[in-house]
Amino acid sequence: MVRLREIPRTAALAWSPGSASPYIATGTRAGAVDADFSNETDLELWDLALEQEGGSAELQPAAKLSTESGFHDLAWTESEDSSRGIIAGALENGSLDLWNADKLLSGASDPLVSRASQHSGPVKTLQFNPRHSNLLATGGSKGELFISDLNNIDHPFRLGNVNARLDDIECLDWNKKVPHILVTGSSAGFVTVWDVKTKKESLTLNNLGRKAVSAVAWDPEKPTKLITSIPLETDPLILVWDLRNSNAPERVLRGHESGVLSLSWCAQDPDLLLSSGKDNRTICWNPQTGVQYGEFPVVTNWTFLTRWNPHNPNMFATASFDGRISIQTIQNTKSDAIAQAGASQVQPVDDEDFFAKAQSQPQASTFSLPTAPKWLQRPSSVSFGFGGRVISVGLTDPSKPASRTSKVRITRFEVDSILSSTTQTFEEALKAGDLRRICETRIENAQNDSDRVDWKIIETLISDNPKMQLINYLGFSSEVDETADSLSKLGLGKSEDGGANGVPESDSRGPGVKKHKRLSSIFDTHADSDNFLTDLSASKGAKTNNPFQIYTGSESEADRGITRALLLGDFEKALDICLQEDRMSDAFMVAICGGQKCIDKAQEAYFQKQLEGPNYLRLMAAIVGKNLWDIVHNAGLANWKEAIATICTFATDAEFPDLCETLGDRLEEQAKAEGDKESRKNAAFCFLASSKLEKVVGIWIDELQENENKAIQEATNGETSFSIHVRALQNLIEKVTVFRHVTKFEDAETQKPSDWKLTLLYDKYIEYADVAAAHGQLGVAERYLDLLPQAHPAAVVARNRIKLATEKTTARSAPAHISAASHLTTKPPQQPNVPRGMYNPSAPMTQANNLFKPPAPMQVSNPYAPTGASSAYSPAGYQPSQQHQPTVPLGGPPQAFGTAQQSNIAPPPRAANQSPSTVTSYTQATNLPAWNDLPEGFAKALTPRRGTPSAAAATISSPFPHQQPPQPSQSPQTISPHQPPPPRQRTSMAVPPPPRGPAPPRMTSPPAVGQPHGFPSTRKTSLNFKCIYPTTQHTPTGPGMNVPQIPRGPSPYNAPPTGPPPSNRYAPSPAAQPSAPQPPRAAVAAPPPTGPPAPAPAQSPYSYQHPPPAHGSYAPPSAPTGARPDHQPQHQPPPPGSSPVSRPGTAQSQRKPAPAAKYPPGDRSHIPANAQPIFEILSADMQRVKARAPTSFKAQVNDAERRLNILFDHLNNEDLLKPATVESMAELARALQARDYETAQSIHLDIFTNRNDECGNWMVGVKRLIGMSRATP
């Protein structure tokens, strides 16, 4: 609830019609006096300028016009003649004036449309018909009620008899559903319903004994319901009427402390009603249930007018006699934390002075609407959730929209079910490692040639010899066979059938090699030709019939040089001579004899000589010279397949990828330059063969876009552009994934911060992860996101989303039960320092180590445990005099089997069925309420609290009888379990009052009751305890007794408890309740024992030892066996008629499941008539307290309100409270309304004391409300 703008005027107001930027028209209020006592009366228009952020809160008028008289009321309606509409003013001089808003804003000299003077006195009220904007109703003095038509403004007609009534008509309102029905309210208390069509009176209501009517308003949706208000200080009421039963109001709304002056019922939400009045307050109600939602900031003078904005109900305006018109919103714009922080900065020094806080702290919004306004509510809504979920909200029963009960559904959503199945199948195949099957499936289902080729190439890479498979894929093995066949047709073979032995020549020379037939026929003329070389084989004494001469004399010089070089073994020189003489055949023969160096020299010379020769020689040169780069860089791209085949055949494994990549780069450049898609596809082949993922991905992404556009153009009715895109993306991701698996690709750039080669692929991975997550496949999405670099910004966000969505909520580990410990332990107990308490011992005391002591219980997390070492019984921030507070070591627990003690202070006996006692205290958190009383500091105490309370205070010394105390520092004197604190006169010096500071923490629950010595229990104590008074006392097993709790000093907000405290799930079991507080009893000091105490009588460790019958309600029991009666402390026996208390069972055994409530919490529509005053009065007073309470006490006030709501729920369900209690609570509410706090307090005490079984957590809220109401001005 934020104040948006302020208009510094005391004026009547009207909102502009239409949905344009809102304006407000103001007219100087008749009878109001400004601070400067000016007599000027003006009509002004104000532009709120809400679109300007941080604009000035106080506005300046956009138009201004002086008038002859002051205004009682203003109305603004739409008009065909004016875009901004017509403004009507009800003037004190009896004139009805109409102005053109457009002319006013433009500054025209004649904005007045008309002026009528039919009224004989002041015009008190007017309103345009909501259905027929040309009809205007005006009411004034002497019962004058006129209906005017703007089209004929000079001839209105009057409703009612002239002499019937002479009272003034103060207010009127047109019915929102039936346009010819009008209601008026008069100063004489008549509420009259008129039928304008028949010009007759239809119905008259008696307004609560004819009390004056200040405002009337029709229900926006129900034509028979209306609301009236009373302006009297004695009866500041709002009456809700249903005309179907007009004898009495249907509901009375009480909340204003003084007369109600104005009402405004929200047209967009009938559950919202504004009222303002003489108590300077503007209150928001639910008129359907009577619930007061809260009030807006209180001003310093009467709020005489409030109006909702007719088109934007988030805003409303309120006019008051302090000279301000406030434009506010019902939307909160500041969090509670900010508001609390702001309040803490202005908190007064004195926390006890409530009035100082109330005056110094700014009044802020004190409520929030429990449900969203109707214009923000939706009967159904839906939202997509991350992870393929759709959250939808719809009415449980659409046939009953008024029920407003909704159901939330979370369902799975898939944009494309085919995609989900495809992804699942693909992921399963990947896990199985069956890549070949994936490739075969994708080849069969390929939608275009490019995809088919890509998958075939990837399939070839899976084989054992990928190079040979690439050659086969290119078709070169069949071409070799075709060439051999064409050579055989030329007759170059020896025979058609075979060689000399009938075996095909190709078989004898190897597969695929055939003998040249023509050469064979040339050398077949000599029979010995085949055996020539055999005959020349080296053998000793070999002699043939073919002698020769090394020199014949006819040789050329070159022949002689070659011969001489051969004789000397100088093959290189012989080769040089052969090359010089261009004897290439001889050169090669010599080179063969000379070794590899000569061969290389001969080959080089040959290729140099054959530069202009056939192309195969260039190819041979590259192969022989191992310079395949010449083919890659210089071979024509039209023969890229031949180049790839050559590379596959002759390239080494090390240079193969680079050679293919270079050839692919040339093809890609050609594709970009010429726009040739075939070259791009060939480039993709080369990149795939070279396993260059970063190169082929760019081509695949381009193809993806092209294929997607083509598929969209050819799409059928059942396909959407998104599903087509997702399938194309799925195909891309599958190809990349399989390719990475086949090539064992490792991304070396995952640790780089930027400039990644695979940026395009990373973007697709992110997109695919989003699609997979949207289909509920979070694991798949996470796997692909893990492939991205760690520093990728989009990947970081996507990973976090996946992580949050897949993160399993770890169940909180339950507190471990304390297992039963062994009876024997040799570990001495730890003895920490005792926190300083209220009782000051004179000397430190210790306790002997107990060999039978059970181990200390495990430290279990306790949200109510105190922080630090503060005592649960001493207020925070208070430390008594240092000389009275020596540090005392904490003794061990009580002995289990009668072992001697050094201390004369023993703990109280523990029953056999009780758990080990634990002490909890109020936590330091400020958002948790106290357990039983008003917080200190809420109101100023009538008497200051003292560290040592008065002995005359009749308080209960210990509200938790069967518990072990939290072991504070104690006096050497033994203190009776029911002994009050020592009186002031016994102290050696006065204890100073505590310093000012925050309110002390209080215990949220009493400690658990005791357990038999040596037997720690694993069972939880019952939570159904309702009474803190002891019911029975059993014989203690030792001389120990309880330490009393420190009672509070007298305070109007923290009075001493005069009756049993409220029902509390941490309180002991209920029993017979005393009718009055117990008086303090004198303590009997027991001297320290001279020896080991006598052992307790044999008894079951799990049974009670009941006391003997008592002679009176306060008679002490007989002395216990084995104890000294002279020093036995006095205990209270059970009251007459009470039976011994059975052991409290576990929470599971005693606590019955609460029956289901008949109606949901917060429902107030079923509160019976006899309980309705309780609800109305307590709610109204609670809202009054909330409005004036300082912000620093927001938590305590909210807790009281929460507890009151528990009471209202019980009343609505008609459970827990009996009829007599309901009647008593009604009397309490009436006393509270009359400010009779003493009577309210006594009724509260009576219910608390005598009907405690009907008191739940709600009773504390009633008690707090009484105290707060008394402290609130």
Swiss-Prot record:
It comes from the Eukaryota. Residues 951-961 have a biased composition (Low complexity). GO terms for cellular component: COPII vesicle coat; endoplasmic reticulum exit site; endoplasmic reticulum membrane. Pfam families: SRA1, TPR_Sec16, WD40. GO terms for molecular function: structural molecule activity. It is found in: Cytoplasmic vesicle, COPII-coated vesicle membrane; Endoplasmic reticulum membrane. Keywords: Cytoplasmic vesicle, Endoplasmic reticulum, ER-Golgi transport, Membrane, Protein transport, Repeat, Transport, WD repeat. WD repeats lie at residues 5-47, 66-109, 118-158, 164-204, 208-251, 255-295, 298-338, 383-411. Residues 991-1004, 1047-1063, 1076-1098 have a biased composition (Pro residues). One of its GO terms (biological process) is COPII-coated vesicle cargo loading. Residues 489-515, 808-921, 940-1168 are annotated as: Disordered. It is a peripheral membrane protein. Residues 859-886, 912-921, 1018-1036 have a biased composition (Polar residues). Belongs to the WD repeat SEC31 family. The COPII coat is composed of at least 5 proteins: the SEC23/24 complex, the SEC13/31 complex, and the protein SAR1. SEC13 and SEC31 make a 2:2 tetramer that forms the edge element of the COPII outer coat. The tetramer self-assembles in multiple copies to form the complete polyhedral cage. Interacts (via WD 8) with SEC13. Component of the coat protein complex II (COPII) which promotes the formation of transport vesicles from the endoplasmic reticulum (ER). The coat has two main functions, the physical deformation of the endoplasmic reticulum membrane into vesicles and the selection of cargo molecules. This is Protein transport protein SEC31. It comes from Ajellomyces capsulatus. The gene is SEC31.
